[in-house]
């Protein structure tokens, strides 16, 4: 009997091949890394429970939930504000019990939805990363306006994305729905080609 067991596939399986692409230069303008090892979840606070939720997160993770589009993180766990009473939680790598644990710890305080297999996550860095992102993202990413710890929900080439600045290098994280991974990859690689890019 044929083996018909389902196997998990990365959102960009067959597309994100390691190597150098685009314009030839000594140093690629952008370095692209797909992250497939993160545990992801959305949180929506229950009515009247926001203060209790903040206390529970602080006790469990040592993190103060921030209001507004900012990210708070500690020891590989982060909570990004994505709306009123809403956060996007991430942990990893290898934090396989993060989402079930989050549900248990926040019982009756927040609705927790596992997003680990539902998103494509890309990390981008390099001297020309802002130039590439500026081709499609209508957010001012100049360091005066978008800094480490900032997050925004926006569009790129009609694709809904969440963008976060992870550090001052800068490294940016782009996240979109799994089903739109191919479209996002097509836009990104075409936009980065003139500067040269490396997939790692």
Residue positions per predicted region:
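Basic, glycine/lysine-rich polyanion-binding surfaces/domains
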Residues: 1-200
């Amino acid at each position: 009997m044929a083996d018909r067991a389902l196997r998990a596939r990365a959102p960009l399986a067959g597309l994100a091949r390691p190597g150098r692409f685009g314009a030839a230069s000594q140093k690629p303008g952008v370095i692209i890394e797909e992250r497939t090892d993160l545990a992801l979840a959305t949180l929506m606070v229950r009515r009247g429970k926001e203060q209790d939720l903040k206390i529970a997160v602080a006790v469990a993770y040592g993190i103060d939930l921030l209001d507004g589009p900012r990210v708070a993180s500690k020891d590989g766990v982060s909570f990004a504000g994505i709306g009123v009473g809403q956060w996007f939680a991430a942990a990893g790598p290898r934090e396989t019990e993060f989402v079930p644990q989050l549900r248990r710890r926040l019982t009756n305080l927040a609705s927790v939805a596992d997003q680990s297999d539902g998103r494509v996550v890309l990390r981008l860095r390099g001297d020309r990363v802002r130039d590439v992102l500026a081709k499609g993202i209508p957010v001012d990413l100049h360091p005066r306006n978008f800094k480490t710890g900032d997050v925004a929900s926006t569009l790129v080439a009609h694709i809904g994305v969440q963008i976060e600045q992870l550090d001052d290098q800068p490294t940016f994280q782009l996240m979109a729905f799994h089903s739109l991974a191919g479209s996002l990859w097509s836009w990104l690689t075409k936009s980065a080609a003139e500067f040269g890019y490396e997939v790692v």
